[in-house]
Regions:
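Recognition helices and adjacent regulatory flanks at domain boundaries
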Residues: 4-5, 16, 30-32, 60, ...
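Hydrophobic alpha-helical connector segments
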Residues: 56, 70-95, 147-154
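N-terminal intrinsically disordered/low-complexity leader segments
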Residues: 1-6, 143-145
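Helix-turn-helix
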Residues: 10, 14, 18-52, 56
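Short helix-capping/turn signature of helix-turn-helix
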Residues: 47, 102-111
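Short, hydrophobic secondary-structure boundary micro-motifs
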Residues: 28, 66, 98-103, 142-144
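Short, basic, alpha-helical segments at the C-terminal edge of helix-turn-helix-like DNA-binding modules
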Residues: 59-66
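Amphipathic alpha-helical packing segments from all-alpha helical-bundle domains
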Residues: 94-98, 111-140, 149-152
């Protein structure tokens, strides 16, 4: 028998594995509880609803795909950073087929605002990272950006 999963991070890890093996349709409270060898109530200790569970799993997938590289040279210039982003998108596509196109469909209609909020936070985090790389890239001329053509507009 599998060891019972007891932490939120372990539940998210099992959820990601369910998506890899069975696709998005496999994600519901009962299936995740069964895969974790815990009761449905144990899942509700961490997640208030299916939408909350799905949202947290989606967020953890984004985190896995785009977690900051241990190779700091990736973030020293924009070309290396963009190449890394594409490598990570390829990784995400292989690990989670259809994720980029389908994840937003997983949110229950009434709870869509929470999903959009999570996605907006993730997107802002990524944009801030790109902005920082642009601002510190030694290959970018100091006069490349001005008040009209800002790093943000780029």
């Amino acid at each position: 028998m599998n060891k019972a999963v007891t932490t939120k991070e372990e539940i998210l890890k099992i959820g990601r594995e369910l998506i890899r093996q069975q696709g998005w349709a496999a994600i519901n409270i009962r299936a995740v509880a069964a895969a974790c060898s815990v009761s449905v109530g144990s899942i509700y200790n961490y997640f208030t609803s299916k939408a909350d569970l799905v949202g947290a799993i989606v967020e953890s997938v984004w985190h896995e795909i785009f977690h900051r590289s241990e190779d700091e040279t990736v973030f020293r210039d924009i070309q290396a950073c963009i190449a890394w982003l594409y490598q990570q998108m390829e990784y995400g596509h292989k690990q989670y087929p259809g994720f980029f196109a389908l994840h937003s469909l997983s949110f229950i209609h009434e709870e869509k605002a929470d999903g959009k909020k999570r996605m907006q936070q993730t997107w802002e985090h990524m944009l801030n990272g790109l902005r920082s790389v642009l601002e510190h890239d030694p290959n970018i001329r100091p006069d490349a950006f001005d008040r009209q053509f800002t790093v943000e507009k780029f």
